[in-house]
Amino acid sequence: MSIDEAKEGGGGPAMSPRAFALAHQRDRGSFVGCSRIADYEVLGKLGEGTFGEVHRARSRKTGALVALKKIIMHNERDGFPITALREIKLLKLLSHKNVLRLEEMAIEHPPRTDKRTRPIVYMVTPYMDHDLSGLLDNPSVRFTEPQVKCYLLQLLEGLKYLHANHILHRDMKAANLLINNKGVLQIADFGLARHYEGDIPQPGKGSGEGKRDYTSLVVTRWYRPPELLMHLKRYTTAIDMWGVGCVFAEMLEGKPVLQGESDLHQLELVWDLCGTPSEETMPGWRTLPGGQAFSSKPRPGNLARRFEKHGPVVISLLKELFKLDWRSRINAIDALNHPYFRTAPLPALPGDLPTFEESHEFDRRKFQDRKAALPPAPKGGTVGRGAVVNSQGPDTGFSGRDGYGGGGRNGANGGRYPPYHRGPPPGDERVPSWHSARGLPPRPPMPADYHGSGPMDHTDGYRDRPPRRGPGGPPGGGGGPSNVDTYIPSYDRDGPAPRREDWRRRDDWDDRRGGVDRDRRRPEYDVRSRDSRTRSRTRSRSPVRDRDRGRDRDAYARR
């Protein structure tokens, strides 16, 4: 039974939140609850990043290998990260062979001598030997067509389950697909996932229409569909299916196929692949916020020519996954029934797939060291390959999310493929898992209906939240919930947490007084983070200086 069916109670009255949660509990034995970190023997570090650290560990009770994901709170005043809360909530509800399973939570209490007051929280999941991005980066790995079909089938089965239960993943990419040496693929990283309202996909009906608005600041740029690049907010499961198309093409080519350096460049690459939009191929695209300033020259797509060597059945499935019209884009149910999976060679069984050496962050560095040991290439590049330009050096690889890394894509995959631009897509997106040294994304363009004379306030309706109201509240005095997505994803870089909004507003106020240089270097410490016992009083009437009672008395006497 799906979440929607349980919520509606089979046509009866709406269920309360508690009844809804109780109806979707997994078997009591499947989620242990909380244990101590001492119950695990830590074996090694798999990766680290903004969200936390991931370690390989062994349970002292069962002997099973697990992955421990340490959840880092960059600013304890902000509380537990909302991305972690949402991920834990969803993973506790979900149970499918192709969805990463949350076994339990583990707690590490700081010693009494430690100044930290809050315990450290770990998510405990089954250990997976690889992620798909890491396998593609391993020069010793070569995917066969039955292997590609096997992985794609499992991905579609997992998405079919998620969408049938009203879950949008919203970050579909190769780095978030974990694979073990038994050939099992599991969807991971639910930090951006959420429950969605509307109809679930039906056979032969595409992805349908959205029912409410959500933030468009989701999905890593190289896997982001054109409707999100044009700031559609009422989107559907079609955004995940576009990501499936990107992953499918990546397995075929051995590298990401749409490597945009900005949102505008990403759209141009989409138009190159699928053709420029029209009312026939993408109805209503002109009404999207990003479609009103569209000025690209009309051109046909090159998808069929680009993937010609893979055959007409592959091209047929890719065209369905890369449809510009999100309403008619193929859903997971129909994709599973596509002739591609019934055409020889047939998909391999997971147990028949070969095993590979581990492909995590530190293993990628090993792959890079192997390449570094090669003799210098001639000026034009290694024979059979072009020169490598704009190299970013070793990639850090781990995003801090469920994927243990996704990193360091070199696009060579055993030397079979031509080179491509190395390095992450700069600009406006979430921190991708294959690169941690990223900055905050630039703000998306202002909405077309903005006619103000001053700078736009980027903290309210700009991110799918209702505009701020005065003391009178919303018009009409209604207090009901607004039909918007209240979740704003985190875009933290791998380093200190960004300044809070109150700092930004204070700086803006100081700027208006003309007395503050916005680019001045801030102190290396943060007064707010100091221990309360050493925090200075906030009502000091004068600058800190040596007190001299006699001098002060003489000064007042002269007045």
Curated annotation (Swiss-Prot):
Residues 400-414 have a biased composition (Gly residues). One of its GO terms (biological process) is intracellular phosphate ion homeostasis. GO terms for molecular function: ATP binding; cyclin-dependent protein serine/threonine kinase activity; protein serine kinase activity; RNA polymerase II CTD heptapeptide repeat kinase activity. Residues 40-341 form the Protein kinase domain. The keyword tRNA processing does not apply. Belongs to the protein kinase superfamily. CMGC Ser/Thr protein kinase family. CDC2/CDKX subfamily. This is Serine/threonine-protein kinase bur1. InterPro entries: CDK (IPR050108), Kinase-like_dom_sf (IPR011009), Prot_kinase_dom (IPR000719), Protein_kinase_ATP_BS (IPR017441), Ser/Thr_kinase_AS (IPR008271). Residues 359-372, 457-467, 491-534, 543-559 have a biased composition (Basic and acidic residues). Pfam families: Pkinase (PF00069). Coiled coil: none annotated. It catalyses: L-seryl-[protein] + ATP = O-phospho-L-seryl-[protein] + ADP + H(+); L-threonyl-[protein] + ATP = O-phospho-L-threonyl-[protein] + ADP + H(+); [DNA-directed RNA polymerase] + ATP = phospho-[DNA-directed RNA polymerase] + ADP + H(+).
